[in-house]
């Protein structure tokens, strides 16, 4: 079964969409009220394979014993903490989905992710907030296989 990490999980919307296809989903979110809402939402939706942890992604990653098969990233405007990126890359998952609300943060983080062996396979911009300057960008990242794999 698939273990999914949903980092910066908010109220758990993405985690709950992925839950039926996964064996287990772990959501990490710094806003405690959002984590409480995520737990209630999962319960209401009858999902028993979701765990939500309140805390900073940078610190929580050090405490997780599970090994993810897929990582979903949906960070705030400032993007992913520079010290968290190497920890995320180190998991070596085949695929990551990065959902960004600020293209410049995404561009900065992609440089690090690409240096860590990931390639952006597909990028899709979504105008979630018409008539504003805001744009959501969804990026599918794939781990590049080394010559001996």
Which sequence ranges carry the predicted segments?
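Rossmann-like S-adenosyl-L-methionine
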Residues: 1-149
